[in-house]
From Swiss-Prot:
NCBIfam families: ksgA. This is Ribosomal RNA small subunit methyltransferase A. It comes from Actinobacillus pleuropneumoniae serotype 5b (strain L20). Specifically dimethylates two adjacent adenosines (A1518 and A1519) in the loop of a conserved hairpin near the 3'-end of 16S rRNA in the 30S particle. May play a critical role in biogenesis of 30S subunits. InterPro entries: KsgA/Erm, rRNA_Ade_diMease-like_C, rRNA_Ade_Mease_Trfase_CS, rRNA_Ade_methylase_Trfase_N, rRNA_adenine_dimethylase, SAM-dependent_MTases_sf. PANTHER family: DIMETHYLADENOSINE TRANSFERASE (PTHR11727), DIMETHYLADENOSINE TRANSFERASE-RELATED (PTHR11727:SF7). The gene is rsmA. GO terms for cellular component: cytosol. SUPFAM superfamilies: S-adenosyl-L-methionine-dependent methyltransferases. It is found in: Cytoplasm. The keyword Methyltransferase applies. S-adenosyl-L-methionine binds at residues 21, 23, 48, 69, 94, 120. Belongs to the class I-like SAM-binding methyltransferase superfamily. rRNA adenine N(6)-methyltransferase family. RsmA subfamily.
Length: 289
């Protein structure tokens, strides 16, 4: 089979710049839809519907479904789908730039109601997209995403493990995180070079470790994990003196992965009350989020 044919599925050639890998394994699709468990009357939104592998079985169970699709050709296919077109609201935009709050608030959600978000996310944008969606956690009921297995491990990690990092902390700050199922490369066309997994993220009704300004939680975790091999005495030296860390009950010889979310929230709230005179925000290193 030619490389071009291996990238073609249902007449559409996967586009590398959009990170497209199309799900086609019916058992996997069934298990994902069962995990989502869509119900009529719920507000459901799919990010990156692609060729409709999840869209079709979800739409079979509900009357309305909103999808966000950047690829013009795929959006056009969905508009002319024989049984989906009358059920779909198609938002042809980049999900990373889309104002989800404005859209969610336009739905006039009832008290205690939230949007249910799902998708087989392009792996090249999955982490920044989740960070984008966390901003709207108060309007979301749950999220089910297909991601790289390695990313799911990071999302679900506990302190004192190599997988534990900034992504772990930010995800678990906003959400309860649960792995759902693992998916082999053969379930996709073209097959990715990595294993995949589905994760469920359920935003907390009440944040367990609230911070006064999430900027400072981002700030302190970025600095700590950018230098994760250093002790916190050294890694956070531009933000805290050793005496200040000790007063906050932080072990000076601990490393970034040893602190809990509660510890980082305590540090963030102290920084909010005592911001450094000069704040040189460190660049976020992708491998540490």
């Amino acid at each position: 089979m030619s490389n071009q044919n291996s990238k073609k599925h249902l007449g559409h050639t996967a586009r590398k710049r959009f990170g497209q890998n199309f799900l086609h394994d019916m058992n996997v699709i069934h298990n994902i839809v069962s995990a989502i468990n869509p119900k009529n009357g719920q507000f459901l939104l799919e990010i990156g519907p692609g060729l409709g592998a999840l869209t079709e079985p979800v739409a079979e169970q509900v009357d309305k479904l909103t999808v966000v699709e950047l690829d013009r050709d795929l959006a056009e296919r969905l508009r002319h789908h024989p049984f989906l077109n009358h059920k779909l609201t198609i938002i042809e935009q980049d999900a990373l730039r889309f104002n989800f709050r404005e859209y969610f608030e336009s739905l006039e959600l009832r008290e205690g109601e939230g949007v249910r978000v799902f998708g087989n996310l392009p792996y090249n944008i999955s982490t920044p997209l989740m960070f984008h969606l966390f901003k709207f956690h108060d309007l979301i009921q749950d999220m089910h995403f297909m991601l790289q297995k390695e990313v799911v491990k990071r999302l679900c990690a506990a302190p004192n493990s190599k997988a534990y990092g900034r992504l772990t902390i930010m995800a678990q700050y906003y959400c309860q995180v649960m792995p759902v199922l693992e998916v082999p490369p053969t379930a996709f066309k073209p097959a990715p070079k990595v294993d995949s997994a589905v994760v469920r993220l359920m935003p907390h009704k009440v944040l367990p470790h609230p911070v006064k300004d999430v900027y400072w939680l981002n700030r302190v975790t970025t600095q700590a994990f950018n230098q994760r091999r250093k002790t916190l005495r050294n890694a956070l030296s531009t933000l805290f003196s050793p005496e200040q860390l000790e007063a906050l009950n932080i072990d000076l010889n601990a490393r970034a992965e040893n602190l809990s979310i509660a510890d980082y929230a305590r540090l963030a709230n102290w920084l909010y009350d005592n911001p450094p005179a000069v704040d040189n925000q460190e660049e976020i290193i992708d491998e540490d989020i």
